[in-house]
Structures are given as structure tokens and as C-alpha cells.
Amino acid sequence: MMEQKQAKGRIFITNDNKMKYSLERSYEILDRTPVVLQDLLSGLPDDWVMPNEGPETFSPYDVIGHLVHGEKTDWTVRTKMILEFGNTKTFEKYDRFAQYEESKGKSLQQLLDEFAAIRKENMVWFKALNLTEDDLDKQGLHPVLGDVTLRHLLATWVVHDLTHIAQITRVMAKQYKTEMGPWPEFFRILNY
């Protein structure tokens, strides 16, 4: 339930109950992610898209490769497993760093185009499933987390997209951190 609160003379909205999972709300984000990333990254020079935050961290380029890999090996594959096998068969362990090999020789634009094409295919497939509430409650078996529901998996897919969009903008923002003089202390994004 949304409610208004007041502090220091300002009104702000809180969402203490958070959103309940909804396929429609998920589609609103999942359908937009490729366009958001295309608009943000397409045509930018390497200075913006190749730096990362240190060992075992992703550059914006790496994130797009990671998203491509996830579209091929995670969300749809695990959904099929849940719907077909329930929690009788364990998901394959996900390789968070597979994109390093899979992205070799590809430009950022190629990865953005590949991500957009695969995501579009996956969304057509997901929507054609006509999933019910009962389907969303079906369980699968994660190799680390144990029993998870399809609802958990699909909500995680949305948060995964949003997390990586935030990661990309954070890594890009840090490119100008030293050029900001004294202002970095006012920008929390630079301290993650």
C-alpha cells in the first residue's frame, strides 16, 4: 500500500508493502531492457564501455555479454525445467563469467543486437505460455538455493535486469569521479 509521509516540510511516497509479483509488471521491464541498453550504450567509445571496477567485476561491455549468456542458458532453460520436471531435477550451475569467452571478437553493437533479438524471442515464448498462478507456484531445484518457485525465478529475472542497468551506469559514472573535484561525496553511486 502506498502512503504519503512528510519530513522536513517535504512530502514523499513510501511503499512499505512492496509490489506483489505480476507477469504484466515483469513484462513492462523485461520488454524495455534491450531498448534502454541500446539507447544508453550504442555508439559510445571504449572509454565509456570497457572499464570495470577491478578484478572479477564487469565493464558495460561485459554486462551485455553476461545478459546474452543468461538469455541463452538461464531464464528460459530454468523455466522449462520447472514446468517439465518440477523440483526433481537440479538446475545446471550458472557460469557468471562465460561471457568472457563467448563475447570474444564481438563488438558491443553486435552484443546489443544479439541481446535484443534473443530477448524478443524469449518474451514471445514466455507470453505464449499463458502462465497461471498455479504455474508460478511450481517449484524447481536450484543447485545452491534449493527449492525455488517459477515466481521467484521470474521476479529475479526482472531484478537482474535492473541491477545490471544500475551497474552499468555506476561503472560509467565512476569514469568522471576524479574529475568532479569535491562533489563525489554527494553521489552515493560512486561509493558502491
What are these regions (language model features)?
Residues 42-50, 127-136, 172-177:
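Surface-exposed helix-capping loop/turn segments at secondary-structure junctions
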Residues 16-48, 70-81:
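Alpha-helical bundle segments that constitute or directly flank the non-heme di-iron/ferroxidase center
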Residues 22, 45, 59, 95, ...:
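Helix N-cap and loop-to-helix transition residues
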Residues 15-23, 101-108, 143-150:
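A short, mixed-charge helix-start or loop-turn motif at secondary-structure junctions
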